Regions:
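Motif-centric detector for short Cys/His coordination patterns
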Residues: 1-86
Length: 86
């Protein structure tokens, strides 16, 4: 199976999700991504699984699924004040 994305990092810092996919790192506010993620505690946030294809991320405790493609598109549409490219 060909990987959609090569995800090398997914972590949380304050109220942000930081994702490195295909050597591109993006930082998005949790409240801009998902209400469930924005309200989650540290344990809930860190209990995630990246799909084998690298296409999606699943949070078991939150019953939340997000696509990496969707996160990258959201990053591209956010205004410069709401995003940070690392």
């Amino acid at each position: 199976m060909e990987k959609a994305y090569n995800i090398s990092e997914l972590r949380f810092e304050n109220d942000y999700l930081i994702l490195t996919a295909d050597n591109q790192t993006i930082k998005l506010r949790l409240k801009d991504i998902s209400k469930k993620l924005a309200k989650a505690n540290e344990q809930e946030l860190n209990d995630f699984k990246i799909s084998p294809s690298g296409y999606g991320i699943h949070w078991r405790l939150l019953d939340e699924d997000l696509s990496v493609n969707g996160l990258l598109k959201l990053y591209q549409t956010k205004s410069p004040k709401n995003q940070l490219h690392i």
